[in-house]
């Protein structure tokens, strides 16, 4: 699972994005991509849906990632996936599953880190806030106009294979 060949997500190469978000390995970056996609799906179901929820919380995103990866893995036998896609989703699901919800150091403060589910989601939302895609207020994350424009263009131009897989649709 990647952003697509020759696609500089948010104007970054994969290496630049790894450095900016704070991850080292490709699988960590791909998990961040999946979390970004999940956040997008929280606000917009498709290009025809201009109504969106007002905000998301970190716990909402974690629950959506849990459900999304579980659904894909449970359907992996019926979905027409290439070997690379199948292995990518298995790797992401196993990596996510192995993460604790929160570490003992994070019990009072939610920190961006690679050692927990909350930490990963916090890294991603921090990145999205820094890119002016989300705005934070009292641990609620609201979409900005920039986010809305990016999402509306994404759906019309680059809906892509990930959308098909997550919605149980096969490529034509």
Label every model-predicted segment.
Residues 100-110, 130, 149-172:
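Short, amphipathic alpha-helical interaction segments positioned at domain boundaries
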Residues 30-64, 80-81:
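Positively charged, polyanion-binding regions of nucleic-acid-associated proteins
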Residues 125-140:
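A short, conserved structural fragment
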Residues 113-129:
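Short amphipathic alpha-helical interaction segments
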Residues 1-47:
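Eukaryotic partner-binding/assembly regions in large regulatory complexes
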Residues 78-107:
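Mixed-charge, low-complexity intrinsically disordered segments
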Residues 1, 140-146:
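Minor-groove-contacting beta-hairpin "wing" of winged helix-turn-helix DNA-binding domains
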Residues 56-73, 92-100:
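DNA-recognition alpha helix
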